[in-house]
Amino acid sequence: MKLIFVSNYFNHHQLPFCDALYELLEGDFCFLQTQPMEEERVKMGWQAEERPYVRYAAKNSCAYKSGGEKTPGSESNSNAVTGAEDFEKLLFTADVVIFGGCDDESYIQERLTAGKPIFRYNERLYKEGQWKAVSPRGLLQKYKDHTRYRKAPVYFLCAGAYVPCDYHLIHAYPGKMLRFGYFPETRHYEAGQPFNHKEPGSILWAARMIDWKHPELVVKTASYLKEHLEENTFHITMIGGGELEEETHRLAEELGVTDVITFPGFQGPEEVRAAMEKSEI
């Protein structure tokens, strides 16, 4: 069985899962990356190790046009670049395609028209609130992308607990939504580990500092705890950065909580996981 996984870029969230597919399918697996990784995510350490099954679609990547300079997160091996005709053939002839993290529907349009099996995956439709579901223009686009395939062999892998609720609103994928997610490396710990190494009162927040992640709520929580606890028996570490980073730092200063919050900036996946293992919350 030939399986193709299409997404915007290959990163540490998908690496263990893709390694397992490559092994289980005895090499009949390909990950097709559709665009170079943004500089911000490169700084976050999202670049995954090179893998033989990763291919880069030249369709949307200026890094491979006219011999141009490669962009951050792009593959150094030019042999891994898959031209338009090649990736169209890959996507059409594969037994199964997993498609998500990419807004360009043209990658799978021919396959959808032919009625071939596709597993779409994504996070929530309405991260900023389900009130957006009333937009006529938005509903028309959701119908074109999702609802009209409700009886076709198109299934949905839900990367989040609230994803089904959003897609129920647009009457898409009835009885065809499955639990999915991001798959970090499985680690086996000895009895009691890592819980007996937790730092007392430690709280960790790790994310990009953008509006719908609400980093300001963590700072306000620190202010509330500092005001209501008899002793400051807690400390918050906020790993990450982004467009709201300076604003979040200013808020911490205004609320007088810089003594109970640490801002280490972006860290790589291994560092973030180590911090999680040490944190109580």
What do the PLM-derived regions correspond to, one by one?
Residues 249-270:
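Nucleotide-activated donor-binding/catalytic signature segment of Leloir-type glycosyltransferases, i.e.
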Residues 162-163, 179-190, 208-210, 243, ...:
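Short beta-strand->alpha-helix junction loop in the catalytic core
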Residues 277-281:
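Acidic donor-binding loop of glycosyltransferase active sites
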Residues 85, 126, 135-156, 165, ...:
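Membrane-proximal helix-turn-helix segments that form the acceptor-binding/catalytic region
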Residues 2-4, 85-106, 119:
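Short N-terminal targeting/anchoring amphipathic segment
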